[in-house]
Amino acid sequence: MKKPLRQQNRQIISYIPRTEPAPPEHAIKMDSFRDVWMLRGKYVAFVLMGESFMRSPAFTVPESAQRWANQIRQEGEVTE
């Protein structure tokens, strides 16, 4: 008998982006990407939404962080 791939009644945890007034001063801007900053050895995207920045989870590659930023930006355009 095969096991089900995931637990049926388990809640799906989704990431709720943090909002910050600005990227931290110790973050290093990645020049080749629009929204990606290097923070403690990981890549984090900061997207300006209204008056504050939304912060992505930490990624190991900058392309992933930029992809997240693009997706957040698209979702923001849809809701406005």
From Swiss-Prot:
- Superkingdom assignment: Bacteria
**Which Gene Ontology BP annotations are present?**
cell division
Locate the transmembrane regions by residue number: none
Q: Does the keyword Cell cycle apply?
A: yes
Give each disulfide bond as a residue pair: none
Q: Tell me if Nucleotide-binding is a UniProt keyword of this record.
A: no
Q: Which family does it belong to?
A: Belongs to the CedA family.
Q: Name one GO molecular function term.
A: DNA binding
Briefly state the protein's biological role.
Activates the cell division inhibited by chromosomal DNA over-replication.
Task: Cite the source lineage.
Answer: Bacteria, Pseudomonadati, Pseudomonadota, Gammaproteobacteria, Enterobacterales
What's the protein name? Cell division activator CedA
Keywords in alphabetical order, please. Answer: Cell cycle, Cell division, DNA-binding
Q: Which organism is it from?
A: Escherichia coli (strain SMS-3-5 / SECEC)
**Pfam families named in the record:** CedA (PF10729)
